[in-house]
Structure formats: structure tokens, C-alpha cells
Amino acid sequence: MSTKIAIICSKAFMKRIISIAQNITDIQLEFYLYSHPSEAPTLMKQIKPCDAILFGGTLPYLHTQSLLSEVPIPWNYIKQDETTISTTLLSLVAKHAVAIDRISIDVMNPAFVDNVLAEIEFHGQKPYVQHISITEPTENILKRHIALWNSKNIDFVITSIHSVFDELQALQIPSMRMLDATKSIIQCLEETKSKSLLTKSEAFKAVVGLLEIPKDCSIGSTVLSQITKATFSTFK
């Protein structure tokens, strides 16, 4: 039986995950799309019966974090880490030949950028890093990118927010989305599937019990059959 996973994500991420998910057996994906990550809590209320929930990024996960304690099924999210940053920077340098110090990049944790640059022993001028927080409107991040572009301090923008990317494209500012490594997405899908299977196996663990019936009390086979049916058990 396949594992049904509800995925809360953007339209762009849906296209990417569909192309990757075919490498994983016995999963069924159902998408709930947002224009902005802040819409994730509303989408949570629309989810149909499924085996697990997957958020297409850290932002939609953070917006729904307070609701997850009430969710009876496993959940997971695509995490932004050093692998994501390094994959994106490598793609940028290879395809666009833009200098690191001419980039504005928005990330969940600025330390990830520092860690990647330290790992490759980069000692030059660092990129302009914009910290993403759910307490700050994404419009502010967009404005900072635009200001750096208008002042000619940058030649390119890397963004983790799909709505910001769409705005930058409309303004014809050179930009790209953050790239989640294919391997990371596959691992997250496999992990989500495993969590669901584990939850199911825990729910159906066999339990041995003893029902003691007083000698002066007679229970017919019909009553015993009703008890075993209600508890999904057998008796001897």
C-alpha cells in the first residue's frame, strides 16, 4: 500500500518535487499550493485524509509550527542547510559567472553562508546576506534586494522566497531561486515515508491481555465475539 503525503508548497516547488518523486516507490503525493508561505496554516485546515504532511521549506513549517502539536500524523519539512547554499552558489558561479561579493542572498540562517565560505576557504568580500524571519514581512527583504540593485552594489539576487523571485523577475532584476539538492529532497521524502510506516506499525502492535471472568458469571460466545471484534483481537 502506498504512503499518501500531503505537500504544502509553492507551485514552483511542486514542479520540482514531481520530477524527483518518481524515483521513490509506493508514495502518493497530494499538493496544497500557496502564493506565500504565510498561507500554510489555512491550507493545513484543507488537508484531506493522508498518512503524512511535508512542508516545502522552512518558512511554511514555521508559520504552522503552533498547529503541529494537534496533528495526529507524522510531518516533516525541507530544511535549508549548508548543502542548499553550496549547491546554489556553485550553480550561480557556473552558469552566470557572478562574483560572490556582487550577490544579495536571503537565507533562514546567515551562519550557513559563513560556514560554506569558510569550508571553501573563501577570504574575499562576502555577499550581502538578508536574514529571513517570519516576524518580518517578505516585502522588506524584497525592498533591500531592490535597493542594492538600484545602487549598483550587486549584479544578482538569490532568494529562498518564491514570491520574491517572481517580483524580481517582473522587475527584470537578474535572480534565481535557492536550489534544494535532489539528494536532500529524496532523503526528506524517504524519511517522511518511513515516519508514516513507523507510526502505522506502532498503532497495530500486538498486545497480549488476560480477561478474567468470575466463575459465577457466564458470558456467551456471542458476547466474546463482540468484544474481540471491537478490540480487533482473538481469544482462546
What are these regions (language model features)?
Residues 29-39, 45, 51-61:
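Hydrophobic alpha-helical transmembrane segments of multi-pass membrane proteins
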Residues 7, 43-44:
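Extended, charged helical scaffold/adaptor regions
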Residues 50-63, 71-236:
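Hydrophobic, helix-rich cores of sensory/ligand-binding and other regulatory modules
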Residues 1, 14, 44, 108, ...:
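Detector for methionine-enriched segments
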Residues 1-36:
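N-terminal basic/disordered segments at the start of proteins
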Residues 39-43, 141-144:
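Short acidic active-site motifs
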